[in-house]
Amino acid sequence: MSAFVVLGAQWGDEGKGKMTDYLAEEAEVVVRFQGGNNAGHTVEVEDKQYKLHLIPSGILHDEKLNVIGNGVVVDPKALFTEIDYLEGLGVKVTPEKLIVSDRAHLIMPYHITLDKLKEKARGKNDIGTTCKGIGPCYTDKYERSGIRVCDLMHKDSFAEKLRINIEMKNGYIKLLGGEELNFDEIYNEYMAFAERLRPYVKDTSVEIYNAIQADKNVLFEGAQGMLLDIDYGTYPYVTSSNTTSCGVASGAGIGPNMVTNAVGIAKAYTTRVGKGPFPTELENETGDWIREKGHEYGVTTGRSRRCGWLDLVILKTTTRVCGLTSLVVTKIDTLAGLDKIQMCVGYELDGKVIDYFPASLEDLARCKPVYEEFEGWGEEVADARSYEELPENAKTYLRRIEEFTGTKVSIVGVGPKRNQTIRVREEL
């Protein structure tokens, strides 16, 4: 029995989509357990590029069951747009390949409207939301006023809950200067969604449990990254769900003891999108060089990513919080060509060196990175297909990551394509 989770070990955008696609070859079931279509994964297979937001990366493989779990918030319009996009690229998306939890909460038009209005109202204190309605949907979920997929399957129940929500939300929308929403328009649109969605809807918790009990390999695909976790991230510049391994059990509907391995995905450097402290950020030519060579622009928003040196304090924190059993280091190819490479091994705060990630943003903003310097590797590594083919300086860099975090590197990424992947160890 093997059930393992793939998680972002930094601020997201670490290459989880590619690695999930790669590891999906060994899995029979691939599960999304949190987030929504605010996530963005890019996967390159042969000469085709696929951009995924909501559907698990395993959809690119035939004979894999892909699951959108109860912890995910689902925008039906975005879901069907993605299905149509994939089928246009020749990828079949049928109810035999994709199922959606009947307990998942629905993103409604008023969630998106409120997301935009509230972000605008924050002014210079905006939190960098993608304005996809994710946060307001999770708010309704925990406020117990949300509408779930199972509600959509019963038109009378859906109509009643929708009417109550629209009456309440329109008052808030009006207060924020927006235009009130129309019940009939939303009801009719979602009734059309209901008929198309119905064949995909199942009790996904049962399906996942049965797969694990049948000794099938189940891969849980995390979205965003550990530092965007609602509890352990750089709050309030975070997402609205639990992005750590702790979120798998509740977001997929299984016992925590069923997940046997946790694989953390980390870039060979660090990036983040939006506001918030970033101790190793490079606001210079080197940072610009990394951004351009690594094509560091968001899949969902197109926003440029802030770039900096690899921060081992972050990776050590992720290892502790998520119980990582191994690390995957991606984009080692991006650093090829730099004469010197630095790696953060601690923070100086108030005259003391610490090796943990402070909860307070004010404290984090005052942290000065303590660096170790490494010799770069001039050779391009995009064609390397084994660990032995990597430059010695790159191996030294990887060994230091293992030493500091106490976690083995199992896979190294040397490019965006599926075959640009080096398996260092079979064990995850």
Curated annotation (Swiss-Prot):
This is Adenylosuccinate synthetase. It comes from the Bacteria. It is found in: Cytoplasm. Belongs to the adenylosuccinate synthetase family. The gene is purA. Transmembrane segments: none annotated. Its EC number is 6.3.4.4. InterPro entries: Adenylosuccin_syn_GTP-bd, Adenylosuccin_syn_Lys_AS, Adenylosuccinate_synth_dom1, Adenylosuccinate_synth_dom2, Adenylosuccinate_synth_dom3, Adenylosuccinate_synthetase, P-loop_NTPase. GO terms for biological process: 'de novo' AMP biosynthetic process; IMP metabolic process. Its main location: cytoplasm. GTP binds at residues 12-18, 40-42, 305, 331-333, 413-415. It is an enzyme of class 6 (ligase). Homodimer. It comes from Clostridium perfringens (strain 13 / Type A).
